[in-house]
Design a protein with these regions (language model features):
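Short, basic interhelical loop/turn and adjoining N-cap
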Residues: 34-39
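Residue-level marker of alpha-helix boundaries and capping positions
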Residues: 4, 31-32
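DNA-binding patch around the recognition helix
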Residues: 1-7, 41-66
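Short amphipathic alpha-helical interface segments
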Residues: 7-22
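Short acidic, hydrophobic short linear motifs in intrinsically disordered regions
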Residues: 22-31
């Protein structure tokens, strides 16, 4: 997995999630310019961040917990 200190893509997503609000997969893709949000969430967890996810209808949402 990628280390946060060496991954701009993880840093961009973490910056977005730091407001602790729920963000849809689409919003994260568009605002952080990434893909595979579920993989990024897993990598952030491996870096010690409590990323939560939930499904609302057909939309997955993510936020920084803890």
């Amino acid at each position: 997995y990628a280390r946060l200190s060496k991954s701009e893509r993880l840093q961009r997503v973490l910056k977005l999630l730091k407001d602790r609000k729920w963000h849809s997969t689409r919003k994260i893709i568009n605002q952080a310019h990434v893909c595979a949000v579920n993989s990024i969430a897993a990598e952030l967890r491996m870096n010690g961040y409590a990323v939560e996810c939930k499904r609302v209808g057909d939309v997955w949402r993510y936020r920084l917990g803890g």
